[in-house]
Design a protein with these regions (language model features):
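Membrane-embedded transmembrane-helix bundle of lipid-linked glycan/lipid transferases
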Residues: 1-212
Length: 212
C-alpha cells in the first residue's frame, strides 16, 4: 500500500507545503503558483483553511511534509473526539459523548474521505460539523441566542475548509428546517437559523466573491 494513501492527499500536502514556505519567505497569502498546471491562483478556487492548517502541522513537524500529514491525521482524530466530548457534557451525557467521539473518526464515511479519497478538507470539516448540527438543534428547540454565533462561526469554518461540502450541509439543514417547521410550526426559529447560515457565507465575502 502506498504511503500516504488517498487520491488527493499529495495535492493537500503540496498546497500546505507551498503555503508553509511562502509564509517563511514573508508572504502570508500566496496568490500565484507557477508549478501547478501552467500556473494557478492557488487560493482562488480552493478554500484556504485546510492549506493553512496543513502548513501549521508541517511547522510543528519541523518542516517535514509527511510528518506534518501524520500530525494532521492525529489532530483531526483528537479534535473530533473533543467536539463530541463537549457536546456530551452539554447534554449531561459525558460518557455517550466520549464514546461517540472515539468512534466518530472511524466511521466509514470519515475513513473514506481521509484515506481513500484523500479529501483532507472534508476531513477537517468533520471537526466542526457535530458542533454546528448541535447548535442548530439546540436553537430550534430552545431559541437560546448563544447558539446563533456558534452556528455562524462553525459554518464559516466549514466553508473555509470545503465550500462545496458546506453548501451540501446547508442544503441538508434547510430540508431539515422545512420538515421541522411543518411539524412544530416554529417559522421564526427556522428563519433565524437560515439567516445565521447565510451570515456564515457573508462573513467569507471578501474571499468568496473573488473565488467564484
Amino acid at each position: 500500500v502506498a504511503y500516504p494513501t488517498g487520491s488527493d492527499t499529495m495535492y493537500h500536502i503540496f498546497r500546505g507545503d507551498y503555503v508553509y514556505n511562502s509564509i517563511k519567505e514573508g508572504s502570508w497569502y500566496p496568490i500565484y503558483n507557477s508549478m501547478w498546471y501552467n500556473g494557478v491562483e492557488i487560493m482562488r478556487y480552493w478554500a484556504p483553511l485546510t492549506a493553512y492548517y496543513m502548513a501549521l502541522c508541517q511547522m510543528i513537524a519541523g518542516g517535514g511534509q509527511l510528518a506534518g500529514y501524520l500530525i494532521f491525521v492525529g489532530s483531526v482524530c483528537f479534535f473530533n473526539s473533543i467536539s463530541w466530548l463537549i457536546i456530551g457534557r452539554k447534554m449531561n451525557r459525558p460518557y455517550l459523548g466520549a464514546f461517540v467521539g472515539l468512534i466518530w473518526f472511524f466511521m466509514p464515511n470519515n475513513l473514506l474521505a481521509l484515506f481513500v479519497e484523500g479529501n483532507l478538507a472534508r476531513s477537517l470539516c468533520m471537526i466542526f460539523l457535530p458542533v454546528f448540527i448541535y447548535a442548530v438543534c439546540e436553537y430550534l428547540s430552545g431559541r437560546k441566542r448563544i447558539y446563533i454565533p456558534i452556528i455562524i462561526v462553525t459554518f464559516a469554518l466549514m466553508a473555509m475548509c470545503h465550500l462545496g461540502y458546506a453548501g451540501m450541509i446547508a442544503l441538508a439543514v434547510l430540508i431539515y428546517c422545512i420538515v421541522y417547521m411543518f411539524q412544530q410550526g416554529n417559522k421564526r426559529a427556522v428563519l433565524e437559523v437560515i439567516v445565521s447560515i447565510l451570515l456564515g457565507f457573508m462573513v467569507l465575502g471578501i474571499w468568496l466573491v473573488a473565488s467564484l
